[in-house]
Amino acid sequence: MMTCASSDDNESEKDKDSESFVEVDPTGRYGRYGELLGSGAVKKVYRAFDQEEGIEVAWNQVKLRCFSDDPAMTERLYSEVRLLKNLKNSNIITLYKVWRDERNNTLNFITEICTSGNLREYRKKHRHVSMRALKKWSKQILKGLDYLHTHDPCIIHRDLNCSNIFVNGNIGQVKIGDLGLAAIVGKNHLAHSILGTPEFMAPELYEENYTEMVDIYSYGMCVLELVSLEIPYSECDSVAKIYKRVSKGLKPEALNKVNDPEAKAFIEKCIAQPRARPSAAELLCDPFFDGILDDDDEDGENNDNNGAGRIVVS
């Protein structure tokens, strides 16, 4: 004799097929899975889901106990991340929501998720890439930096490196991420605290008195890594040795492995002394990018062409 499954049995079967959330945000819109996408000194990034839009997102979680000795820093961190929510640029990871979890003492923020992971791993996976492709990626990073640096107030990333740049490989799109610890500075564009990844840190950053030009230096190191497939200063086996070489003005050995003279000259411009470094806007006009168009450039060109020959009546 055949028995019919109860509705409870059907529901339990459905539950087995669905992936349960580890936690949800206070509004119930975003659910976090247990899958860890990446982690750093103070932050972990998990795969999550936006139930309203039906899209996957990234759930970033900062442990505030890392700043327990400095309550002012905690509040500043929170206010800065909230401000970043207002950034709108195709080469900057979009920030959707920010909140503080008092019970677990964490700062949480939801960002868009990129399909192909970070640029460092993506480049390792695709070792045989044309210089044209590398230039397209580099130009997009620079456009994101230009947006940050010309924002009012100016935003200095301070930790730009290839692991903080993310890729949508299906469309060749590159986005700057990990902006949660960026510095938001006033009219003088001066910042004073030390943050960053040693291999990518400009010399003046160690001196705790710097401007957005530290990002240009880091950007140059990113381009060097993309071209050479080597992390800058990998010849050093300690942070102290990196600092010693950087403070003496010694360039990373990877620079000597760059065979393309145009690429080498471009990188050297980026990692020059602070006053000699071009701005992001100036670098975008560099001959290094001649003939390199990305989607935004092509859209603009198409719009110009579409407007050609039209008569505008006022």
From Swiss-Prot:
EC number: 2.7.11.1
Catalysed reactions, as listed in the record: L-seryl-[protein] + ATP = O-phospho-L-seryl-[protein] + ADP + H(+); L-threonyl-[protein] + ATP = O-phospho-L-threonyl-[protein] + ADP + H(+)
KW Kinase (keyword) present: yes
A Pfam family annotated for this UniProt entry: Pkinase
CDD domains documented for this protein: STKc_WNK
Domain Protein kinase: 31-289
UniProt: ATP binding residues: T111, E112, I113, C114
Superkingdom to which the source organism belongs: Eukaryota
GO MF, any single term: protein serine kinase activity
InterPro entries associated with the record: Kinase-like_dom_sf (IPR011009), Prot_kinase_dom (IPR000719), WNK_Ser-Thr_kinase (IPR050588)
Region (Disordered): 1-22, 295-314
Keywords from the UniProt entry: ATP-binding, Kinase, Nucleotide-binding, Serine/threonine-protein kinase, Transferase
Active-site residues, Swiss-Prot/TrEMBL: D178 (proton acceptor)
PANTHER family: SERINE/THREONINE-PROTEIN KINASE WNK WITH NO LYSINE -RELATED (PTHR13902)
Function: May regulate flowering time by modulating the photoperiod pathway.
Homology family: Belongs to the protein kinase superfamily. Ser/Thr protein kinase family. WNK subfamily.
The protein's name in its UniProt record: Probable serine/threonine-protein kinase WNK11
High-level lineage: Eukaryota, Viridiplantae, Streptophyta, Embryophyta, Tracheophyta
